[in-house]
UniProtKB/Swiss-Prot annotation:
<comment type="similarity">
    <text>Belongs to the aromatic prenyltransferase family.</text>
</comment>
<protein>
    <recommendedName>
        <fullName>Aromatic prenyltransferase</fullName>
        <ecNumber>2.5.1.-</ecNumber>
    </recommendedName>
</protein>
<feature type="glycosylation site" description="N-linked (GlcNAc...) asparagine">
    <location>
        <position position="142"/>
    </location>
</feature>
<dbReference type="InterPro" id="IPR033964">
    <property type="entry name" value="Aro_prenylTrfase"/>
</dbReference>
<dbReference type="InterPro" id="IPR020965">
    <property type="entry name" value="Prenyltransferase_CloQ"/>
</dbReference>
<dbReference type="Pfam" id="PF11468">
    <property type="entry name" value="PTase_Orf2"/>
</dbReference>
<keyword id="KW-0732">Signal</keyword>
<keyword id="KW-0808">Transferase</keyword>
<comment type="function">
    <text>Prenyltransferase that attaches isoprenoid moieties to carbon atoms of aromatic substrates in an enzyme-catalyzed Friedel-Crafts reaction.</text>
</comment>
<dbReference type="GO" id="GO:0004659">
    <property type="term" value="F:prenyltransferase activity"/>
</dbReference>
<dbReference type="InterPro" id="IPR036239">
    <property type="entry name" value="PrenylTrfase-like_sf"/>
</dbReference>
<feature type="signal peptide">
    <location>
        <begin position="1"/>
        <end position="22"/>
    </location>
</feature>
<feature type="glycosylation site" description="N-linked (GlcNAc...) asparagine">
    <location>
        <position position="337"/>
    </location>
</feature>
<keyword id="KW-0325">Glycoprotein</keyword>
<keyword id="KW-0637">Prenyltransferase</keyword>
Length: 364
């Protein structure tokens, strides 16, 4: 065949590819469709583009998702958790992992999973983000992950039913088991509405004026920590990250003010329209234990200075999502020397975390 005949044949082939392979209802796997299209593009470049421009044409074709782990697999996950724990010198317990994965088998398979770690040498954690409104407390009780008379059950049950579309997720430690139950509240809501929900302790309700005075008007998520009996409230703060804003918020747990030098390490990673801010509160006393500022959707090749522990975490924690999600949070607690302050890191593992958070309207 001469060049013109090759051209006609290829054009017909590309039209066929568009109909049969790119069609979203095509029975062929996504990988096959993308690989075919990229191969056809490469052939077209070979026939029609000068050698120096061929790579540019191919680069514009859709790239296939090369991961072999398109869906959550418990055995693969245990292996990945074990290897990451070894790398970070963190505790790992096979029996605990089996109990967690057996209890929440469908949640892990249906949801999106992410890794968690801090700049301290305090282990590895992971979370599943659910896509459906399901009970996550009952299975934990039935499988002895928490006690059936735990004092935090009425509160988290109330928040899980705060709105009809609220969704519960869970955090785990690979050596200790269930750590937190975490609620997406179905959108952004006035802080007061969450505080007056049934079964919220008076110690938490009494914080309304202090939270509002600090500019924390809008709440997005809430969580309970089963081990420390603390609660986490996550707020949307629709303001730029400035020194006065930061120093106002870190006074909640009694943290001394930071300076401009510290702020310059944080600010480049925050968007100007606002940020996610979290508080940790002791339910027994109503005291703020910790606050955190979350920088979201970070480029894995342009992360903040965070120390060797977290740098290793982001390098070695595998992500099988098509779009990696990297999150860093600066966490402040009381204490004059800053020894209780640290940095938190989160990273997508599998299940298309970006899609879940986008569906929630999250700035993440």
């Amino acid at each position: 065949m001469d060049r013109n005949q090759w051209t006609l044949a290829l054009m017909a082939l590309m039209r066929f590819a568009h109909r049969a392979f790119i069609n979203p209802v095509s029975p062929l796997p996504k990988f096959s469709r993308l690989a075919f299209t990229q191969g056809a593009s490469r052939l077209y470049a070979t026939l029609h583009v000068d050698a120096g421009l061929q790579d540019n044409v191919v680069d514009k074709a859709a790239k296939p998702y090369l991961s072999r782990r398109l869906k959550f697999n418990a055995e693969h996950f245990k292996q990945d958790v074990s290897e990451l724990c070894t790398t970070l010198n963190a505790d790992y317990n096979e029996g605990v992992m089996n109990a967690v994965l057996n209890t929440y088998k469908e949640n892990f398979e249906r949801g999106a999973v992410l890794w968690k770690a801090t700049s301290k040498e305090d282990g590895v954690a992971f979370r599943f983000y659910e896509r459906k409104k399901v009970d996550v407390v009952g299975p934990a009780i039935n499988n002895s992950l928490i006690s059936g008379n735990h004092g935090m059950i009425p509160l988290i049950t109330s928040w899980a039913n705060f709105k009809k579309n609220a969704i519960a997720s869970c955090d785990f430690d690979p050596a200790k088991g269930l750590c937190k139950t975490w609620i997406w509240l179905g959108g952004r809501h006035p802080t007061r509405d969450l505080l007056v929900a049934p079964n919220v302790p008076g110690t938490i309700r009494s914080l309304e004026r202090k939270l509002i005075s600090a500019g924390l008007h809008t709440v997005r998520h809430a969580a309970v920590d089963w081990r420390s009996s603390t609660v986490n409230l996550y707020f949307w703060v629709p303001r730029p990250l400035t020194l006065p804003v930061v120093n106002t918020l870190i006074t909640l747990p009694g943290t001394p003010p930071i300076n401009e030098e510290k702020l310059t390490l944080m600010k480049p990673f925050f968007k100007p329209n606002g940020f996610t801010f979290a508080t940790t509160i002791d339910t027994a006393t109503g005291k703020f234990k910790r606050v955190s500022f979350y920088a979201l959707r970070l480029d894995g090749n342009n992360l903040p200075i965070m120390g060797d522990q977290l740098a290793t975490f982001f390098k070695d924690a595998p992500s099988n999502d098509k779009t990696e999600m990297n999150i860093v949070a600066w966490s402040f607690a009381g204490g004059s020397n800053g020894s209780s302050n640290y940095i938190k890191g989160e990273r997508s593992y599998i299940g298309d975390l970006e899609q879940v958070l986008d569906a929630w309207g999250s700035p993440i």
